[in-house]
Amino acid sequence: MAVYDTHCHLDIVASQGIPVDQSLQNAIEANLAGLVQISTDLRSASFNGSLKEKYSERLKMADAFSLRWTAGLHPEAANELESLNGIFDIVRKHRDEPEFLGIGETGLDYFHTTEFVKEQKESLNQHLKLARELDLPVVIHTRDTRQYEPGKTQSVTDTLQAVKEVGGIKGVLHCFTYSYEEAMPFVEMGWKVSFSGILTFKNSHTLHEAAVKLPLECLMVETDAPFLAPVPHRGKTNEPAYVIHTLEFLKKLRSEKLGEDPEKIQSQIERNIQEFLSFKG
């Protein structure tokens, strides 16, 4: 298996009771090829930069297990704009290291409050400009208000506008939860779309439709651990090893709806992940 968990937060998983070395061991035992550790603020960006050295002994026990990482400021932390200089210093310092993948997560989140929309948009714009300057992929987080209606997602619309204004950027819509129509403008620019454990939830009808209609060549899977554990672990602390459940659900869904061969689905998703990992210029 050459599947990665393309988005997780090992530091937050550890704060919920699963130590980092245990998460790594569980992922290795689940036959994952690797994972992408995502930053949300200056503290986690610094943590990510020390991962390889701190857990080198655990990683040596695995044959070719790959640990990649990013640095960025989560939109819900956009009131900490003054920390961007420190985060971007980390990006520039580690940019050419093979383990460093890109920028993020960044984006727009209107779910709890729109109080810091101006700061969120400024943060997103600065991340996008740095991504273009350094030829790095960007990991995008979008979440709308509780009154979300399919096809009317302001956070996605605003993010698309920002991406187009800066131009020349590739990336991934992480933990995608919206419609086919909202994903396609990004797909047409060569972006990837990543599904979390939400895909396995029974009532995720709009997401199921998107997972069937979107081109297989753009799809990836993730955990967003420790959040959003997939069925059959829903309600538990999520971890990278659980990404296999989302993958299996996606394979079953497309096989049943489209008649696609499950092995070919998995092979293509593995290729998609490798393409994403090579977005870094």
Q: Where are the language model's segments positioned?
A:
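Mid-domain alpha/beta scaffold segments of enzyme catalytic cores
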Residues: M1-G281
